[in-house]
Regions:
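A short, structural micro-pattern
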Residues: 261, 565-566, 626-628, 655-658, ...
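Basic- and hydrophobic-enriched, low-structure N-terminal and domain-boundary segments
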Residues: 1-211, 215, 220, 228, ...
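Hydrophobic alpha-helical segments involved in membrane association or supramolecular assembly
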Residues: 69-73, 77, 97, 489-497, ...
Length: 725
């Protein structure tokens, strides 16, 4: 604040009064007025009547001078010092000054015979100590005004402006996931909760390796959804890291007295590396693929999972060959689903189907009527083709083009899909045919392993992929292996695709399902955005974990990535590094808020303080990238809240529940003793198939592998025998 000339004048007057009071003290105590005439003596005697100048009251005089110094310094407006040192500039001078003042009183009362001119030595020393003491006290108190109390650089990283009130209350329901946390706000590290009250709107978790996203988010989803009676589908990229946790909670909640787990809940695993730990399942059957459209989607899933993100950016010819490959594979899938299909009851017992001969192909075609062994007409639980599974299809794809088309064209439903291929074959356009089918055969040949043939074989269909069926609920653990990621990922994608179509039905009658996929880019989740967007009514919670947006874009393509991140309602992030991820979180999730900024200007004559409000990032990108392990930030999806207003529609928008933020920036606060107790209770995973030795396992798998090829040869011979020439 700039001083006016009047204030400067008052300050000079007060400063002069200080030293006048010192001179008056010397006049009364140190000088003998008798040689100076009657006028001086009269003045001396009059002043002597003042209490502070009476004999023996020198201490009062010193106190009065000290008070004058204090009053004068209150109005001082010195130039501020950024590097203010209170000890050197205030404490040391003040203590020294008070010491000299006390010393001056002692010197005055200690007579010394030595004289200098008309004054005794002790009087001269008293006067010198008094002046030095007052000057030092004046300097010390004057320096206090040089202190800049505005706290420059006190909040160097802008923590105060970027901290905000977060949810302190636990909000729970039958489906919620609640994560205890602590957050900083207004000088306190407070306790709160991250309440994901609607997991059916989807959740994605992003963070660099080691940021704690699995421990902080994925594991609480497993723990709490298992406890609340969900059917859980879990993808374990590094088997058995998450598998042991899931199995622990399955056993814990199954055996609990107050368990919410549905009766009959089973635990299943799919593992293409250690087949002992795997159930067998057949996703290629009419139960899951009941029309040609479903076959086309299955084919598209398998092909895109093998290509993972390579579909985008191609021209018209690339799209033509891509579509041709999908149509060809779809024709093969649907053919095998229907070839010599037989009806079965719910217990897997074959029923008797009424059939008539097709005049064109001489094949026996079911009429639709089904009877049991007693001759009663019944409704079958499902139909199953004789070789309706993925191993037989993969083996069939290795046959010559001529043989493949001769077999497929015997099915009138798939024949229309074969037109372009047959034309190319008749015209000897082998390069075109290789472009349409050859790439598909190259990709799918990688899937033809002993393990995949064993697990996907139709004779080993151990469980139904509709894990949310109230009559037959189950947990499903889908395992992968980093060393065989692409191949196993494609096989797992096939299972997941058919599973999703089953659980995303039922008109809300299914039990709640939690699909948890950590390390999403290692698994191709076909049209996952569609599942997230439509699965709320069927109570399907989808949780996706990945490291960075560019990683997701590399495997799902830019369009696929955008579809995923824009349909998810709950967003959680650990530490991130990618520019795209940081900009998305800082700008689109957290946005900007009004912040109070303080500016201080110091020059020779004045110090100015400016306060202003402006919009700035609530959580800047640099703050997200610098988060330690265990810290998370993000935003949860909010459910409908009834609007409450006062008289005349008035509303305090700052206190209204409807306008409270669901954003969070916090440190997770788990009970580590409970987690340690949980980890100590982990048990070995179950083996579903037992082999006497590793060699026996290899013999059994190889025998099954060879048998599939023989089955395909037998099928081809049968069809060619009855084929109309």
């Amino acid at each position: 604040m700039e001083e006016s000339k009047e204030l400067q004048g008052f300050y000079k007057i007060f400063r002069a009064v200080i030293y006048i009071s010192v001179l008056m003290e010397f006049f009364e105590y140190a000088i003998d007025p008798s040689p100076m005439g009657s006028i001086v003596c009269d003045l001396h005697s009059r002043i002597k009547q003042w209490m502070i100048y009476q004999d023996g009251n020198m201490a009062y005089s010193k106190i009065a001078t000290f008070l004058l110094v204090c009053i004068t310094c209150v109005g001082t407006r010195n130039k501020k010092h950024l590097e203010f040192d209170a000890r050197k500039q205030v404490l040391y001078p003040l203590v020294s000054g008070v010491g000299f003042i006390v010393l001056s009183v002692w010197l005055f009362n200690t007579p010394m015979e030595m004289r200098v001119y008309m004054f005794s030595l002790n009087t001269l020393l008293y006067m010198a100590a008094s002046v030095i003491g007052v000057v030092l006290v004046h300097i010390a108190l004057d320096n206090i005004s040089k202190f800049l109390k505005e706290g420059l650089l006190k909040d160097r990283f802008n923590f105060e402006n970027e901290s905000f009130e977060q949810c302190k209350d636990l909000q729970t329901n039958d489906y919620s996931v609640n994560i205890p946390m602590r957050y900083y706000y207004k000088g306190k590290f407070r306790k709160g909760w991250v309440n994901i009250v609607n997991p059916f709107r989807g959740t994605w978790v992003v963070g660099t390796p080691g940021s704690g996203k699995t421990f902080s988010i994925i594991e609480p989803f497993i723990r709490q959804h298992s406890e609340k009676g969900f059917a859980v589908v879990l993808y374990d990229y590094k088997f058995p890291t998450l598998a042991t946790k899931l199995y622990y909670h399955y056993l814990k909640n199954k055996n609990a007295k107050d368990s919410k787990m549905p009766k009959g809940m089973k635990f299943n695993m799919i593992n293409f590396v250690d087949v002992e730990y795997s159930r067998r399942v057949n996703p290629i059957q009419l139960k899951y693929i009941n029309n040609l459209a479903a076959a086309s989607e299955t084919a598209e899933t398998l092909l895109e999972s093998l290509q993972k993100g390579k579909k985008e950016g191609g021209g018209g010819s690339d799209q033509f060959f891509q579509t041709s490959a999908v149509n060809f594979l779809a024709a093969c899938i649907y053919f095998f689903c229907n070839w010599e299909k037989e009806p079965y009851d719910k217990d897997g017992n074959m029923l008797i189907a009424e059939k008539v001969q097709d005049k064109q192909t001489l094949r026996m075609i079911p009429t639709g009527r089904v009877f049991d062994k007693m001759g009663n007409e019944v409704e079958p639980a499902y139909w199953l083709g004789k070789y309706s599974d993925m191993p037989h299809i993969l083996s069939f794809l290795n046959e010559s083009y001529q043989t493949i088309f001769e077999v497929l064209e015997t099915d009138n439903e798939v024949a229309p899909l074969l037109g372009p291929f047959q034309t190319a074959l008749k015209n000897r356009a082998m390069e075109q045919l290789e472009g349409m089918i050859g790439t598909l055969r190259v990709y799918t040949s990688r899937l033809a392993t002993k393990e995949s043939y064993w697990i996907f074989h139709k004779d080993g269909d151990d469980f139904d992929l509709k894990v949310s069926d109230p009559k037959n609920p189950s947990y499903l653990l889908i395992a992968n292996d980093p060393e065989m990621e692409s191949i196993i990922g494609a096989l797992n994608a096939l299972i997941l695709n058919r599973l999703v179509t089953r659980v995303n039905t039922g008109q809300g009658k299914n039990i709640p399902t939690s699909i948890i996929v950590d390390e999403l880019p290692t698994l191709y989740f076909h049209k996952i955005h569609r599942l997230i967007g439509t699965a709320r009514s069927n109570k399907v919670s989808v949780t996706l974990g990945f490291q960075e947006l560019p990683q997701l874009e590399a495997d799902y393509g830019k369009v696929g990535m955008q579809k995923i991140i824009t349909t998810v309602g709950n967003v959680v992030s650990g530490s991130a590094r990618s520019k795209e991820t940081l900009e998305w979180l800082s700008s689109d999730i957290f946005g900007k808020v009004v912040q109070l900024k303080k500016g201080v200007t110091i020059d020779r004559d004045k110090t100015s303080i400016n306060l202003n409000e402006n919009m700035d990032s609530l959580v800047p990108a640099s703050k997200i990238s610098d988060m330690p392990t265990g810290w998370i930030c993000g935003q949860t999806a909010r459910d409908f809240v009834k609007t409450k207003t006062g008289r005349g529609g008035s509303m305090n928008i700052q206190e209204s529940e409807e306008f409270k933020t669901s954003k969070f920036y916090c440190k997770t606060d788990f009970n580590m003793a409970d987690i340690k107790k949980e980890e100590d209770g982990y048990v070995a995973l179950p083996k579903f198939y037992t082999f006497k030795s590793r060699d026996e396992r290899e013999r059994i798998l190889y025998k099954n592998f060879v048998q599939v090829g023989e089955d395909v040869k037998s099928m081809i011979n049968t069809i060619q025998r009855y084929r109309v020439k």
